[in-house]
Amino acid sequence: MIVSMIQFRIELPPLESIKDKRRIVSSLKEKLSNKFPLSVAEVDLQDSMRYAQIGAALVTNSKTFGESLMHKVLAFVENNCEGVLQDAEIFSETF
């Protein structure tokens, strides 16, 4: 069993409240879950109004497929996010 994962940080546009951040993050998580077979969560920086840290994972039997899908996720985020992608890390673990 292989778990492929991506973690990325987004710099958000200027926000007036944490509710605005939740709206942006929830929208992105929903878009990712609808488009890709992933589990998605905000994994860090929940109290930050400037940044969001998102993680997503996929259980697969192919490291190549999993990492290829994560690169597609990254491209999707770059083109469909209300913020600016700051950094991303893609990796896989075999269990």
Segments and roles (model prediction):
Residues 38-44, 86-89:
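A short linear hydrophobic-aromatic micro-motif
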Residues 4-12:
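Short glycine-/aliphatic-rich beta-strand segments at the starts of folded cytosolic domains
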